[in-house]
Amino acid sequence: MSEALLNAGRQTLMLELQEASRLPERLGDDFVRAANIILHCEGKVVVSGIGKSGHIGKKIAATLASTGTPAFFVHPAEALHGDLGMIESRDVMLFISYSGGAKELDLIIPRLEDKSIALLAMTGKPTSPLGLAAKAVLDISVEREACPMHLAPTSSTVNTLMMGDALAMAVMQARGFNEEDFARSHPAGALGARLLNKVHHLMRRDDAIPQVALTASVMDAMLELSRTGLGLVAVCDAQQQVQGVFTDGDLRRWLVGGGALTTPVNEAMTVGGTTLQSQSRAIDAKEILMKRKITAAPVVDENGKLTGAINLQDFYQAGII
């Protein structure tokens, strides 16, 4: 029984892969035309389909929407009972139907023509009523479904999903859609945290900033280290410019070397030291700390003035790992 199940599963995958392998050679003028229609669309892409085509259509609409092309899904039955009012003349409709002969099309196509809405077809029958009415036809035909009875949509739904991905990715690249654009559509996700957060969003402010003046003593800096627990203190001049940092390591080395606590901190600090820009991406700032093998750093503005402090734990808590 186990071997029979494995063979059935493998056979299904092989058949679907075989059918999908024919898709690249079908991309041509119609694919380019469909992509250009979407690129020049001033409204939204409205995806529609029935049954399994509808389920795949929802995913295609979601992929378009998350990669820079406003899109949503409308069920054909709902469209014919009021939702056609959601579709405007500046929109584009992508209708998915393997047979290309869904009865709802008899009523939908004239309404689209009345509104001068461009129709794109994703079908296994390019010469069907859907294919003939469309401005561009994306051929998702298969020689056979992976279903042993040749009935359940299997190979054809894989082809539909892949063609939708191909179209969405081509349009995305043509738009110049990048990682930061993607993150703006996914602000609650890990990618959003990594790419949208700036250092100033995460840094510690006001009294939580460990800092002493250049004229302070090593004792003053030690007390500030203890108060904030960040592992470093920013040493600033009268204009709040960071002149150096005094770290736990600096303190240990100073005491082991017999240095006095009353000595000015500028004699014991690390001159210069690493600072982070407040407007930098948090992910880039974290990489700087990791590369330099330090756990914290002062944060400065574009003029070099101290505005905050941050450590690795602040990044981790924000989901930037």
UniProtKB/Swiss-Prot annotation:
Residues 203-261, 269-321 form the CBS domain. This is Arabinose 5-phosphate isomerase GutQ. Keywords: ATP-binding, CBS domain, Isomerase, Lipopolysaccharide biosynthesis, Metal-binding, Nucleotide-binding, Repeat, Zinc. Homotetramer. The record marks K52, E104, E145, H186 as: Catalytically relevant. GO terms for molecular function: arabinose-5-phosphate isomerase activity; ATP binding; identical protein binding; metal ion binding. Residues 34-177 form the SIS domain. Substrate binds at residues 68-69, 75, 81, 107-116, 141-143, 215, 267. It comes from Escherichia coli (strain K12).
